Amino acid sequence: MKETVEGTSPRICQIWGAGQYYGHEEASPDAAVIIAADGGADEAASRGVTPDLVVGDFDSITTDRSAFVDLGGNDGDSTHSPGAPAPDESRPSSADSPSSMRRPSSQGATTSPESPSPTKYRRLPAEKDDTDMLAAVKLGWEAGCRIFRIYGGLGGRMDHTLANLNMISLVAAAGGRASLYGDGIIVTAISRGFLSFAPWRSGERAMVSVLSATDRSEGINERGLKYQVEGMTMTNLELTGVSNEFLPNTPARIGLDRGIIYVTYPDAAPMPSWHTDITPATSLGHLDTRPSRWLTRPGRDQVEEETDPTTSPVQGSE
């Protein structure tokens, strides 16, 4: 079943991360773009999936990149002609554009008689604010994708799992939808809109949970579930929405008016249709390739603070 937005089929990006896998991940035939974040390229390759693009600092990948096309510009290893301007490290290159990342229309069949383009890769520095996963999502967004199916984004390192939850909230705020696939469960985030689930044989205790990702989420509706609510307000300090249940052969709808909510549901559930009132942002921001400007510089900042007259104690204040 295809994911739809207001009756349309939006451009879908499938991302392979370097987190935990559970044995049932596979290629999405309807994905317009497939991107691997660093070591996710190994997981994709082990399942016979060829990404359009591999991005990251390459601290976890083992896949041979000799056949990949290097987009360059960020790793310090790539060179450019003497006297030529250095590549813009923050913007996706023209090679990352939608026209350069074409996918088969279905597995085993391409959209043209030509062979698929070789996998491209873009190396990023290790010291940067964005995770490799967020870089992959940003590039997918630049390629026109608004729905993201992410493998390897749950489990493994807890800090990365938490970062990925923040990331799918970012996508929701920008007018898109990203889903993290786990062990029999999918986690997604939505804002100012709703998810609609078709009737299905849910069986007993087919759990669906709703939690606020923002400080406050308002106008929450849960219809067609065991516990139904209308116009509820949740905060991110409440756990009220945990462990609701699908009802067998009953359509369900989950939505909200303001804020962002997380929704978790079984991967056996039908793919929900999705509506949002948010006009998609043109960008999720430039690729981050440098350490945060907020970082202190050990030693130097301390000296500057001690010698700065504006920070010296006022005479007689002690």
Predicted features along the sequence, with ranges:
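N-terminal beta-strand-loop-alpha-helix module at the start
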Residues: 1-73
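Gly/Ser/Thr-rich loops at beta-strand to alpha-helix junctions
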Residues: 21, 154-160
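Intrinsically disordered, low-complexity terminal tails and inter-domain linkers enriched
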Residues: 70-118, 286-289, 300, 305-314
